[in-house]
UniProtKB/Swiss-Prot annotation:
InterPro entries: HMG_box_dom, HMG_box_dom_sf, HMGB. SMART domains: HMG (SM00398). The keyword Oxidoreductase does not apply. The lineage of its organism: Eukaryota, Metazoa, Ecdysozoa, Arthropoda, Hexapoda. Keywords: Chromosome, DNA-binding, Nucleus. Found in condensed chromomeres. Binds preferentially to AT-rich DNA. This is Mobility group protein 1A. It is found in: Nucleus; Chromosome. Residues 5-71 bind DNA. Belongs to the HMGB family. Disulfide bonds: none annotated. One of its GO terms (biological process) is regulation of transcription by RNA polymerase II. Residues 105-114 have a biased composition (Acidic residues).
Amino acid sequence: MAEKPKRPLSAYMLWLNSARESIKKENPDFKVTEIAKKGGELWRGMKDKSEWEAKAAKMKEEYEKAMKEFERNGGDKSSGASTKKRGKAAEKKKPAKKSKKKDSEDDEEEDESD
């Protein structure tokens, strides 16, 4: 069975992927997070985003067609991927450990020494 189509990138992500190298060249000491921040600033300052929005819209249409085809062919019933959680939220969390409280005797000793 075919794999579920991946969601399309947003206009911003398409642009950032193409602009990332030039941002790195202009700012070689930037970390990944700083590159993303700079990219966000540049994106917000852009006047004409129509090229990237058109590319994103085309990718979204292709994704929607692929999803319809995927669902028509039975979807992903066997693996249950649609109900599966991803990332840290999917991991079972252990209950938090109780913090040890300071002995009340210590508190009383501090009060007496004042």
